[in-house]
């Protein structure tokens, strides 16, 4: 059980924001919201609220995004009319490197990288998202930005417990990720993206590496259907 104290934005027209409120969470669900001066739910009588020193917003959780790419308009490969059947295909498009890969690489390594990422996160907030997955791979400390970054979540330990890969990993690397999951990490993996039959091999590799667990967050998986 968890109790969070701070300014609470309700987004309910018949219920004003709470300047000093407490939000109660149990079993992964919001149990109640009230003023700090009000009596808590009975099961939270001995739970001390955690001071967030900020504002608590309701919001969407986006578990699949590419934040830096969100700076650009939607990319479309010129001249192609047939849909792709595998995530291994579109990187070979003539304009992909110039219009997608190169700009993202420049943005992530520029002196203004933090500002660039903040702008992309502001776009997410405008759409109602308050937690997002898909932060660029970097050693720079982005945690604590406008939107909660799932990839960089430390859960208060100071240690990154979430790893991710948008690229297909070989079996030996998957086995390393499986060991990290057994040690308590979470692994976000782009898996079997497309409809081509060969993509099923990616799922078999994940299975053979013993990565199928509750700590695997598998994205796409369209070839499994």
Predicted features and spans:
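Short, solvent-exposed loop/turn and secondary-structure capping segments
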Residues: 35, 71-74, 145-146
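Glycine-rich, histidine-containing beta strand-loop boundary motifs that form or position
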Residues: 34, 65, 71, 133-137
